[in-house]
Design a protein with these regions (language model features):
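Solvent-exposed loop and capping/linker segments of extracellular ligand-binding repeat ectodomains
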Residues: 1-270
Length: 270
């Protein structure tokens, strides 16, 4: 652990000059006295473990200029409550390391247990396992230009009670929201053309859902069962939440054979 001093005075706030374009690996690692740092809009890369162990941070804003963030860049920032990011993972729209855990240097959400809010300001996709296992998150905001939500992207985000899915999203991956027990009402926009298997499995407190179609795909060529998006299990063939009462369908050209079979708890279908 380290601290920064100026004339024997502990520095708790730091403004990085606007001329800086790169923050190197371990640049501020272990500076436990820092409570606030302002990163200029010119910065394009943040290195591995750049801010690791900065336990004084509560809120962080990473500017949109940043295009890459190193592994474990914020590892050990255990008091962090909110972070604003230009994308999720290592690189904007990168094919690998697209999870929040990558920048926190941990797996399956075992990072900052105090983290409550994540605001994503850029990128066109939310990758597979992006927020998976972050049970303490209560607020996640994704940008309007996102077109895909990956496999298990929000799996087990039990603290989430609401998520606004922008009407630019076209695909939602398998198990994308499975285990999100905080959801009571969900609205899937008309822009979505495919929904993966068990995308909403384990959303046990869901009371209403609005969908652009019934089943897996808008064109009706794949599975057309309403239960498909809730998954199946060996002990319960139709894994639909017991409290689900209202289903609103806003699009699609047909309702498939036996689409709502064994959906006894639903009282309203529009």
């Amino acid at each position: 652990a380290h601290n920064l001093y100026l004339d024997n005075t502990l520095i708790t706030e730091l403004v990085i000059p606007g001329t800086v374009t790169k923050i190197g690996s371990y640049a501020f690692s272990g500076y436990i006295g820092l409570t606030d740092i302002r990163i200029p809009d010119n910065v394009i890369s943040i290195g591995d473990s750049a801010f690791s162990g900065c336990i004084g941070f509560k809120n962080l804003v990473i500017p949109n200029s940043v295009t890459s963030i190193g592994n474990a860049a914020f590892n050990g920032c255990t008091n962090l409550e909110s972070i604003t990011l230009p994308f999720v993972g290592a690189e904007k729209d990168g094919e690998e390391n697209g999870s929040l855990s990558y920048i926190f240097g941990s797996s399956y959400g075992a990072a900052s247990l105090k983290l409550k809010s994540v605001v994503v300001t850029g990128g066109t996709k939310i990758g597979s396992y992006a927020f998976s296992g972050y049970t303490g998150l209560t607020d996640i905001r994704i940008p309007d230009n996102v077109i895909s939500i990956g496999v298990s992207a929000f799996k087990d985000c039990k603290g989430l009670t609401n998520l606004v899915i922008p009407n630019t999203v076209k695909t939602i991956g398998a198990n994308a929201f499975s285990g999100c027990t905080g959801f009571k009402n969900l609205v899937i926009p008309n822009s979505v053309t495919s929904i993966g298997y068990a995308a909403f499995d384990g959303c046990t407190n869901l009371e209403s859902i609005t969908l652009p179609f019934v089943g897996a795909e808008k064109d009706g060529t794949a599975n057309t069962d309403f239960a498909y998006i809730f998954g199946y299990s060996s002990y319960k063939p139709y894994n639909i939440p017991s409290g689900l009462k209202t289903v609103s369908i806003t699009g699609g050209e047909s309702i498939g054979n036996a689409a709502f079979y064994e959906c006894g708890t639903i009282t309203s279908i529009r």
